[in-house]
């Protein structure tokens, strides 16, 4: 976890891997001292009126530093009702069995697609570690030692109009806002997920007019490239 004490992760993405289930997990390393800075963790170090005045850091001392995760499993779960269905849990557990295999393929495919896009005349730039330079690539090389994953972005020449045309011309790749699917997915955020933002807000979020986000799936790269090629030819 690279010294992270708690991790919140969407299992809907690569763990599920097939776009069939919705869920998330909280992972507590069990190593963080939740009592060290009580003023920064008041919910864990002061009486909880919703749970009989319990002070979570004191109540769990015999069990170790698990105040956060225990509170999450009692009061937060109780108040929010975030209870995963048994079938979804089964799908995620099943997905974990092939996660390592799929991630290797996602990463390998994405490397090929990133190289293809970076050499295409209709593409201004590609956002993917292997074709980038500087700080971002250095960090990726340090931490992503088993591959750079399947998520990438690219800036298409011609701005918003070209971005929309590209998306609408895709035949095999799905136009979906999800990521981490076995299928390749593409979306033009400026005209869909972030369309309510002003131009200034879009730019501050790193979303340029021709930006397209891709989640590269497990199809053969020849098929992915063929679909991108015919779509790019129509802008």
Give residue spans per PLM region.
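Active-site C-terminal subdomain of aminotransferase-like
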Residues: 9, 15-151, 155-183
